[in-house]
Amino acid sequence: MLEMRFHARAGQKMEAAVELLTLAARAEGKYAQGFTKRSSSSKESSVRGFVRVDEQPITLNSEIEEPDLIVVLDEELLARREVTKGLKPTGIMILNTTKAPNQIREAYGCQATLGVVAADQIAQEILGTTLVTPPMLGAVIKVTQVVPLEALEPLLMERLGPVGKKNFAALQMAYKETVIQERES
């Protein structure tokens, strides 16, 4: 089973990413489960998302404490210890950043396999917005191959109509531009 945990700030529409990835996996004949949880403090509100995908029925129904994959929609969230907590030793972290993987390793002491993508720039260039959900989904698909990239296109078109094409284009660009660096030993 592939277990993924997403971290975002409120308003980044991370819930849509969780839902779309879950629906795409189901459309591909896999078992999938996805849900989100909001947490708020006096300073700011954040959202965590959880996705499980498997070839077998999923009987768990809990938050994911030890994910195979952590997806961070806002690099500033890495300053919070709980964001990377529990990542499996063979785990992968995908991050929205303009920094190279080695810069992330130096800044945050991350030893996991890293996938980095400039999702903010892609969203601005293609969508004219700061909505990073489509580019981050492209990065997730590149790193995990959990579903074919094309599995998202009909879902985006169905949900967003004509704007779905631009969202799929952002997803495709992120898929191509995501840089993966294997974990450090």
Please describe what each predicted stretch is:
Residues M1-S185:
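Active-site cofactor/cluster-binding pocket
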